[in-house]
């Protein structure tokens, strides 16, 4: 994705290119084949979802063709890990590769050790600690429970992105809010977060994450 004259231009393959990824299932298979893959084009030519799909259906909300929609579907399946893993931007990591990926990003630290060595912020610790009692949380729930806001902690988006970059948090799903009185969904889809360990329990990847 490049900005040319104020207009965002998507890269991609021709519609009839035999190497084009055509479905979200094919994309999962490709991620498992290569190990990890950013969503958008970057400084490494050919190393992104964008480089392997058509540029015709981005943000059309078509589950059959829209790669932006595919990321929601794939996160929901849990078959690969999704989050802001690459230069603070979105991407995927296979469950087989995730332990090595996370170990590298964490410099070998689990979060408790990182905190003890004063390498983690108190804001990051507050977020990670939430998952000792919660299997998953909407992003707005994390924000509220930790006390981010005008009169409280600052830069929630930056902190939660740092935790994803370090492999401590992943995006489990995208869901709408539910009204308390009747459970009816409303509004935009919102990211739902969890830890890699809890994600592994959900999908049965006990030996992989």
Feature locations, PLM:
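Long, low-complexity intrinsically disordered regions
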Residues: 1-209
């Amino acid at each position: 994705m490049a900005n040319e004259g104020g207009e965002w231009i998507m890269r991609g393959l021709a519609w009839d290119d035999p190497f084009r990824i055509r479905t979200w299932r094919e994309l999962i298979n490709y991620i498992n084949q290569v190990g990890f893959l950013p969503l958008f084009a970057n400084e490494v030519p050919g190393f992104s979802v964008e480089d392997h799909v058509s540029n015709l259906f981005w943000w059309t909300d078509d589950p059959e063709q829209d790669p932006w929609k595919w990321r929601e579907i794939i996160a929901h399946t849990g078959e690969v890990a999704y989050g802001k893993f690459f230069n603070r931007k979105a991407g995927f990591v296979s469950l087989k590769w995730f332990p090595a990926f996370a170990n590298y990003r964490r410099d070998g630290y689990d979060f408790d050790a990182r905190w003890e060595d004063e390498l983690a912020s108190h804001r990051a610790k507050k977020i990670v600690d939430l998952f000792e009692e919660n299997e998953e949380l909407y992003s707005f729930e994390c924000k509220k429970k930790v006390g981010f806001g005008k009169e409280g902690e600052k830069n929630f988006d930056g902190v939660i992105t740092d935790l994803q970059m370090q492999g401590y948090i992943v995006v489990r799903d995208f869901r709408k809010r539910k009204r308390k009185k009747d459970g009816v969904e409303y509004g935009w889809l919102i990211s739902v977060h969890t830890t890699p360990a809890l994600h592994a329990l959900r999908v049965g990847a006990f030996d992989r994450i």
